[in-house]
């Protein structure tokens, strides 16, 4: 198993790349991707052939940092290494010397299942022929795709549960020696009732959801550089802590969040510090499906 899990990490920001660099910085302060934020992070594809691997950290043999989308796992991450031996060495090192990220002592251990990338590397080494290997990978991908869909699509999840309930109902009726024609009738009635309930619940949900009015976004393109950034079009519920994780550095002075207008003023020590963050993130930044704009305040 070449994957490890981390627990008790800081709550992750929406930007996975920034989070990855944060972990790299604490794992290895000399990591080139942690030192230079403008250096693009490597992305490894599934090993469907003997293609070269690109490492996040050469010293540790670290390949990938994976983050679950589940809200229950906001303080967790999974790290994939090139080999099981490198994962074991990493685990042994931080068993004797605690790893801390932003002051939090990280708990870690071997993952119960390998990451998809780690699994593909493992299967690539063991594969006897391409056809069998590709079928195995497709099976894993299909299962994980279904799992993601069930988490994100409530209707799909309910229909999936309904199919399972129908299978159990059929099994229960057959164990009671009920005639097949009667089983079909009972199952049909059960399925119809459940589908009607789902449809009714979905319609009620649509009626209760009213579109929120968004505050007008001011044009900051012509504003001269200064040490205060204006962050606009923030998602509802954005917190100062979240903004600090995205926009914070050692030069951060203050974050003034104006929730009713979905914007924030972020002040740094110097104009150069503010400019550096703006250039790093760009004029627009994706946050929870919102195109957040970043510019200099007047």
From Swiss-Prot:
Subcellular location: Nucleus
Gene3D superfamilies recorded: 3.30.70.330
Domain of life: Eukaryota
Effect of mutating residue 295 to S: Splicing defects
Residue ranges constituting the RRM domain according to the UniProt record: 2-113, 227-298
Main localization category: nucleus
GO molecular function: U1 snRNA binding
InterPro entries the UniProt entry points to: Nucleotide-bd_a/b_plait_sf, RBD_domain_sf, RRM_dom
Biological processes per GO annotation: mRNA 5'-splice site recognition; mRNA splicing, via spliceosome
Pfam families to which the protein is assigned, alphabetical: RRM_1
GO cellular component: commitment complex; nucleus; spliceosomal complex; U1 snRNP; U2-type prespliceosome
Effect of residue 268 to F: Splicing defects
Outcome when changing residue 4 to I: Sensitive in DMS protection of U1 snRNA
Quaternary structure and interacting proteins, as annotated: Component of the spliceosome where it is associated with snRNP U1.
Protein purpose: Involved in nuclear mRNA splicing. The principal role of the U1A is to help fold or maintain U1 RNA in an active configuration. It is the first snRNP to interact with pre-mRNA. This interaction is required for the subsequent binding of U2 snRNP and the U4/U6/U5 tri-snRNP.
Note: Present with 2950 molecules/cell in log phase SD medium.
Name of the molecule in the record: U1 small nuclear ribonucleoprotein A
Name of the coding gene: MUD1
């Amino acid at each position: 198993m070449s994957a490890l899990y981390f627990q008790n990490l800081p709550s992750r920001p929406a930007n996975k790349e920034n989070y990855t660099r944060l972990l790299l910085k604490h794992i290895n302060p000399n990591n080139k991707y942690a030192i230079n934020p403008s250096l693009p992070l490597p992305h490894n594809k599934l090993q469907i052939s003997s293609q070269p691997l690109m490492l996040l950290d050469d010293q540790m043999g670290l390949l990938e940092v994976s983050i679950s989308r589940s809200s229950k796992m906001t303080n967790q991450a999974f790290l994939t290494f090139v080999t099981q031996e490198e994962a074991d060495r990493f685990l042994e090192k931080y068993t004797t010397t605690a790893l801390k990220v932003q002051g939090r002592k990280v708990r870690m251990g071997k993952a119960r299942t390998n990451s998809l990338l780690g699994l593909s590397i493992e299967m690539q080494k063991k594969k006897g022929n391409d056809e069998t290997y590709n079928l195995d990978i497709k099976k894993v991908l299909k299962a994980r795709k279904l799992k993601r869909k069930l988490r994100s699509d409530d209707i799909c999840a309910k229909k999936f549960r309904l199919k399972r309930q129908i299978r159990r109902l059929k099994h229960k009726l057959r164990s009671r020696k009920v005639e097949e024609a009667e089983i079909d009738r009972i199952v049909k009635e059960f399925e119809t009732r459940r589908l009607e309930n789902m449809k009714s619940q979905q319609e009620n949900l649509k009626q209760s959801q009213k579109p929120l009015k968004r505050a007008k976004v001011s044009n900051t393109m012509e504003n001269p550089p200064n040490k205060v950034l204006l962050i606009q079009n923030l998602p509802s519920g954005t917190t100062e802590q979240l903004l600090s994780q995205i926009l914070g550095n050692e030069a951060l002075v203050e974050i003034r969040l104006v929730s009713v207008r979905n914007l924030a003023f972020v002040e740094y020590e110097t104009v150069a510090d503010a400019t550096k963050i703006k250039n790093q993130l760009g004029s627009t930044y994706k946050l929870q499906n919102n195109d957040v704009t970043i510019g200099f305040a007047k």
